[in-house]
Regions:
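Charge-dense, helix-prone N-terminal extensions
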Residues: 1-109
């Protein structure tokens, strides 16, 4: 994990850090060469000109990935923001297989 992102996460509760790292690991499982860095103080994961952002809050994480909208019908148990970000709250399971698909599609299109 990027040291800059690690430092940024220190301001959040352990539960959010744990959730963040679980989601982040799914990004790295795409097996593409990820460049992780903070962009506008937001953890961002780049491959070529594609990006995924994980935005932590006190009780959830917003995921910004361009392919989320393609799978909205499979994400009805989760909230999508008006900007198309997926919100994963602490009390929800991570839809790992679906996120793997979304992340790979986002990064390789």
């Amino acid at each position: 994990m990027n040291q800059e992102i690690n430092e940024y996460l220190k301001n959040y509760p352990l539960e959010i850090i744990t959730l963040f790292k679980e989601i982040e690991s799914l990004i790295y499982q795409t097996n593409v060469s990820i460049d992780a860095k903070l962009w506008a103080k937001l953890p961002s994961y780049y491959y070529n000109d594609q990006v995924i952002r994980l935005i932590p809050f006190k009780d959830h994480i917003n995921i910004e990935a361009s392919s989320i909208i393609n799978y909205k019908d499979l994400l009805t148990d989760y909230k999508l923001t008006p900007k198309g970000m997926l919100q994963i709250f602490l009390d929800k399971n991570i839809p790992s297989e679906l996120l793997n698909t979304i992340f790979l599609e986002t990064l390789t299109k």
